[in-house]
Amino acid sequence: MRKVHVQKYLLTFLGIVLSLLWISPFYIILVNSFKTKLELFTNTLSLPKSLMLDNYKTAAANLNLSEAFSNTLIITVFSILIIAIFSSMTAYALQRVKRKSSVIIYMIFTVAMLIPFQSVMIPLVAEFGKFHFLTRSGLVFMYLGFGSSLGVFLYYGALKGIPTSLDEAALIDGCSRFRIYWNIILPLLNPTTITLAVLDIMWIWNDYLLPSLVINKVGSRTLPLMIFYFFSQYTKQWNLGMAGLTIAILPVVIFYFLAQRKLVTAIIAGAVKQ
């Protein structure tokens, strides 16, 4: 009995330590976003003596917040919509059509997840540049290419839990394959869609590397690209940078907490097979 209590206390202590380690970056960012530059360098971990709300005003002005926010939002929303639709349609075709080629194509999508982006980024950007496609539309197309592998993998697994008898009954009633997918199968895949959306929002919204390679126009830059300019080679405005990071992180945090309950439901639903 005593051994069980010791294990329980150790697990609780370990959980607290891991939670503090996970929260500490957010604490440092939030606390230092309200400090002056001198106060930040004096003691990074201390609470601010006074709340410097001007940091947020200056950061928003320097970021050109409305433009950068709208660019990031447009790219993220369109990328997720296209990834979800393309991945679910592809997975539906591969899972329902029983051919050897379907298995091979599915394996190609699965193996593609193992290819590191860094190994293809230079030739990819070079090819897109030849077609003058280094734009926001080109960036969305790239996100589709890199995000569809995970999407197909998740949807394919979810479709295994949906009986083919639904498809057969709909075909007998005169439904086309597209109507079966759109009106019957896709709504049943909502848990997987929510899971994929949460993962992709956290990836695309916070992505710096790919937009830095693709987007050249100042008016098309995303929030991560604009925040980078607070940490240039010769000037590092850490307090303004922390305020900018807080502004950029806040929408994702709000979305995650709003979608958390549905995400847990999605994970549970995805674990239950017919």
Curated annotation (Swiss-Prot):
Major localisation: membrane
Gene: amyC
Similarity field: Belongs to the binding-protein-dependent transport system permease family. MalFG subfamily.
Stated role: Probably part of a binding-protein-dependent transport system starch degradation products. Probably responsible for the translocation of the substrate across the membrane.
The UniProt record lists the keyword Transport: yes
Organism: Thermoanaerobacterium thermosulfurigenes (Clostridium thermosulfurogenes)
Identification of the protein by name: Probable starch degradation products transport system permease protein AmyC
Pfam annotation, one family: BPD_transp_1
Gene3D superfamilies xref list: MetI-like
Topological category with respect to the lipid bilayer: Multi-pass membrane protein
Entry-linked PROSITE patterns: ABC_TM1
Record-linked InterPro entries: MetI-like, MetI-like_sf
Gene Ontology BP annotations: transmembrane transport
Sorted UniProt keywords: Cell membrane, Membrane, Transmembrane, Transmembrane helix, Transport
Subcellular localization(s) per the UniProt record: Cell membrane
